[in-house]
Design a protein with these regions (language model features):
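Bacterial Sec-dependent N-terminal signal peptides
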Residues: 1-23
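Targeting-peptide/extracellular-domain and disordered-appendage signature
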Residues: 21-90, 95-168
């Protein structure tokens, strides 16, 4: 009887330690919400970290469509019509893809918001493509970050910052 009790206690301790020992995800999900003019903006993305790897122009090659984060494709949602870099965007939810480049980035809003990565990305579903210039950050940004400015969306990772204008 003592043996059975001992094994049951040992098993319970082992199972509970597995539950407690869950690591946080490598690329946790983040949500950015705010206003640009009268429009509410919501961006949902996963935040990869460099972890001693060359990411932009390395693991995420220049000249190829990138999901602009990790895991699911990043989504951006506007509750009112806006202009992105001067181009009309109806209210709605879109995938946010980019094509990174050393001297120029392409920002893509795609009409299909439910995508895993960029594996089934189809250019035919693009609502718009605009080109913007990257800048260098003052400090190294370990974890990919998206933020809302007064009239722009800002992407930062490693030593690169990219912003695109949004006006409502």
């Amino acid at each position: 009887m003592k043996r059975i009790t001992f094994f049951m206690l040992a098993f319970a301790a082992m199972v509970s330690s597995l539950v407690v020992a869950q690591d946080k995800p490598l690329s946790p999900q983040a949500t950015v919400e705010g206003k640009i003019g009268p429009a509410n903006v919501k961006i949902v993305y996963c935040q990869p970290s460099a972890r001693n790897r060359k990411m932009l122009g390395g693991k995420e090659p220049y000249g190829q469509v990138w999901r602009t984060g990790a895991n699911e494709a990043t989504t951006i949602e506007f509750d009112k019509p806006v202009k992105v870099e001067g181009k009309d965007v109806p209210a709605g939810k879109y995938s946010l893809f980019t094509i990174p480049g050393e001297n120029e980035w392409t920002i893509i809003l795609n009409k299909e918001p439910k995508q895993w990565g960029a594996y089934k990305y189809n250019e035919k579903d693009d609502l718009l493509r605009v080109k913007v210039k990257p800048t260098k950050t003052d400090n190294f940004v370990e974890t990919f970050n998206i933020a809302l400015g007064k009239d722009e969306v800002q992407l930062k990772w490693e030593n690169t910052a990219v912003a695109f204008k949004v006006k409502a």
